[in-house]
Amino acid sequence: MSFVPGQENAGGRSSSVNRAGNGILKKTTWADQTERGPNNQNRGRRNQPKQTATTQPNSGSVVPHYSWFSGITQFQKGKEFQFAEGQGVPIANGIPASEQKGYWYRHNRRSFKTPDGQQKQLLPRWYFYYLGTGPHAGASYGDSIEGVFWVANSQADTNTRSDIVERDPSSHEAIPTRFAPGTVLPQGFYVEGSGRSAPASRSGSRSQSRGPNNRARSSSNQRQPASTVKPDMAEEIAALVLAKLGKDAGQPKQVTKQSAKEVRQKILNKPRQKRTPNKQCPVQQCFGKRGPNQNFGGSEMLKLGTSDPQFPILAELAPTVGAFFFGSKLELVKKNSGGADEPTKDVYELQYSGAVRFDSTLPGFETIMKVLNENLNAYQKDGGADVVSPKPQRKGRRQAQEKKDEVDNVSVAKPKSSVQRNVSRELTPEDRSLLAQILDDGVVPDGLEDDSNV
């Protein structure tokens, strides 16, 4: 005997309020809208099932694999799809515990083009299939398959296939996914259709609240075509909005001196322990020069602060607020207040000391060690980050210095001997008389004062 999810066992009664004649829940879900046409005007004709997110290609032909349940969609990147052992099998009436076994299949959804021309990939959606059905019907429980997560009830026999019929979307609608109490849904995922009501159910509830005088109007409303909301429209709209915001946010913003000054002043107005250094307000403006008590930061990281590309991996080592208070040694110290001319106030310091322990199994260990070695005590290295550039000179002083340099750079011919140095001065009568005695003709030439005649 094959079991049909959503149908009561023999002898059971199905509620006329929540179920139709076949016992299937009639709550409209996104999965149902995927499988049904845009309206219900094709009465009397067999609905042609559309290809759903679980449609799989097989040898050139399309073979649809319809899950009995609505999907689970991922909305946060980087999250893993997983359930605890014994959890993860959706609840369905008429399915005994021994048949509650199967797998969740990851469907990588299509991408779309954003207004700025970029391709965006929708996050995947997961669908449940009983063991022995679906796209991996021939797989055994626990096989290592990419994009497959196996789940089973603690009472289920995973060595045999589930005796569950395949779902025909023309006669059976998808069942809203529900789990047993205590089941923990994977973080970063949500169940399709949870917390959402279809437009038809909303209009029906409104018509019932209006009273008997408006029954004719409510019945006419119920004959309205079903909502033409396309599958994944909510995700597409959200993605388009985010893409638009991302486009605007991604445009380069012009940073003026005034805006940079305002950002810097806003940061410096905060308490010291609440400041976040960045390009507009570097590390040394926030926390002072590097030294023995503040010994972290190389030249590049001191300029960029937390905007440095290497900073996020270091942030993994930062303690949480709880670790800071409960995992550190704290000491409250009263400091001297300001000078005599300043108002009297009590100043305290909450001094702390602690340690962050990690080993080589930490993800990114090699990179963390490299960044730490480059930035610890970087101020002690030659040409380190704490080298202060000379202050610029004023214009008047700079011009005077340039003139002085020009005078200093003038090349002056040096005398070759002491005689040449003496000739450069004016000769006295005594000098002329002495020279006349030395010369044969007794006459001192007029050009004797010139260095070239000596």
Curated annotation (Swiss-Prot):
One Gene Ontology term, aspect cellular component: ribonucleoprotein complex
Post-translational modification: ADP-ribosylated. The ADP-ribosylation is retained in the virion during infection. Phosphorylated on serine and threonine residues.
Compartments where located: Virion; Host endoplasmic reticulum-Golgi intermediate compartment; Host Golgi apparatus
UniProt keyword list: ADP-ribosylation, Host Golgi apparatus, Phosphoprotein, Ribonucleoprotein, RNA-binding, Transcription, Transcription regulation, Viral nucleoprotein, Virion
Domain CoV N CTD: from-to ranges: 260-383
RNA-binding as annotated region, ranges: 56-197
Top-rank taxon: Viruses
Entry keyword Transcription regulation: yes
Dimerization: annotated segments: 267-383
First-listed, main subcellular location of the protein, grouped into a coarse class: virion
UniProt xrefs under CDD domains: CoV_N-CTD, CoV_N-NTD
Low complexity bias spans: 193-212
Subunit structure: Homooligomer. Both monomeric and oligomeric forms interact with RNA. Interacts with protein M. Interacts with NSP3; this interaction serves to tether the genome to the newly translated replicase-transcriptase complex at a very early stage of infection.
Protein name: Nucleoprotein
Organism: Murine coronavirus (strain A59) (MHV-A59)
Gene behind this protein: N
